[in-house]
Curated annotation (Swiss-Prot):
Protein's name in the database: Phosphatidylinositol/phosphatidylcholine transfer protein SFH7
UniProt organism field: Arabidopsis thaliana
GO biological process: protein transport
Pfam families given in the database record: CRAL_TRIO, CRAL_TRIO_N
Cellular location(s): Golgi apparatus membrane; Cell membrane
Keywords: Cell membrane, Coiled coil, Golgi apparatus, Membrane, Protein transport, Transport
Described purpose of this protein according to its UniProt entry: Required for transport of secretory proteins from the Golgi complex. Catalyzes the transfer of phosphatidylinositol and phosphatidylcholine between membranes in vitro.
Every CRAL-TRIO domain range: 130-304
Keyword hit for Coiled coil: yes
Superkingdom of the source species: Eukaryota
Keyword Magnesium: no
GO CC terms: Golgi membrane; plasma membrane
Positions in coiled-coil regions: 464-526
Membrane topology: Peripheral membrane protein
Amino acid sequence: MADTKQDMENSEDGRKLVKMSSLKQKAISASNRFKNSFKKKTRRTSSKIVSVANTDDINGDDYLSVEAFRQVLVLDDLLPPKHDDLHMMLRFLRARKFDKEKAKQMWSDMLQWRMDFGVDTIIEDFEFEEIDQVLKHYPQGYHGVDKEGRPVYIERLGQIDANKLLQATTMDRYEKYHVKEFEKMFKIKFPSCSAAAKKHIDQSTTIFDVQGVGLKNFNKSARELLQRLLKIDNDNYPETLNRMFIINAGPGFRLLWAPIKKFLDPKTTSKIHVLGNKYQPKLLEAIDASELPYFFGGLCTCADKGGCLRSDKGPWNDPELLKIARNPEARFSTISEEDYLLVEEGTSMSMVFEPLERNKMKTIEENVSEKHIDAVDKFMALSLPPKPHLKTLRKGKEPQKKDDSFLVGGVIAFVMGIVAMLRLSKAVPRKLTDVALLTNSVYYEEAKMSKPNQDEVSAPPVSSSEYVIMVKRMAELEEKYKSLDSKSADEALEKDDKLQAALNRVQVLEHELSETKKALDETMVNQQGILAYIEKKNKKKRMFFRF
């Protein structure tokens, strides 16, 4: 009898265990479905490689601004996955002094330009066969890195022959070559330098050698090409210049610096250091001698690679670093077994790990239609709190035991998932374009609730006479704007004509000076001949009187 009772108890305990196990599995399954909206599944391997957002170099205020800017881009469908990069967004924000509306317009223009120009495939599609001739008439190239790991770009402007350059290629083709080099810098050079320096790098150091710069280097066509390239750089690749050294700046450069400077952004000009012929100490403060070419006072010659400007020396030539640069999945941080267990034992992946290039959140429930899912994702992206860093989580309490944490975490996630679906199902817009209206209405309701005791004050009506006056003023302002705009265009053309006339006058003066110098040399030769003849006559005369 006791054995029968014991068997019944064991059987009852077994059924309870089975039920608990079933409940546990359902909770875990529901938790996983919910967490799939925020995390990226990983394989448990010995190396435990998972994607970690490298945002340590972004301070707190900038990070909040970038996150807010990112949500603005998401709501306006202006964030393709390949451009979902916090550092890239930060560069655009800095270029517009953290004005989100101006930065958004700049971002939108950049996306349109990339589509019109075919930038995404320009590395594969465009071949610049005339590169050797172009480099012969326009010496330039990347050579090494500075002491902080940034690539160093060098141009010897005094050796540019603008006429031969535009005979070797066209403005349009050189413009495509310029864009291709920028794309290679962002896809290969910057990632390689980041891997070598173990920190994020998206800026470069530039050296412009202006020794011998004169009128022959920058004719009207060369200035037009320069203006087009600067517009591309400022509009589509902002904040990529860390600092610039202009060395060997002489009188010829000072003559041309004023018209060139007006094409540059004021913030860009603040990064430019104009140096004379004693530039070596300043360069060596920023660049190690082993990374600096010999003609700038460094130790590198690159004799076996055709010279420093042809060598393309840098970390991007390292096969291992190049592999990391070309393989986005290899640019992941490696975490320890302890960190991996922290994730396994109930901590949400969205609280610890974040992909380098964020993907849009996936579905919350599989039976929700695809056209509503994107709207849910965007709405939830706005409501999610900032993700704490891994170091912050390490300082917290130790996680619970594995079995308890899975069960508790799974049940909580399951319940929260159901609550979220019930709440969102009432507020999800029918179209993606309604998301902005939805968020605006939510903000209005919250503002209204925060000030329940204040009476609503309606705006005063506008009379017809006031409306007519306003329209007249707007018309006057438009006329003034058009007048000022036409004047500025005329003034720019007038300045260009004056500059061209001044350059032509300088050429004429140089020619006249050369002719005068030639005549002076001939006169001096004749004078020396006359003096020699007189000396000869005097010598004969003295000999005659002696006898």
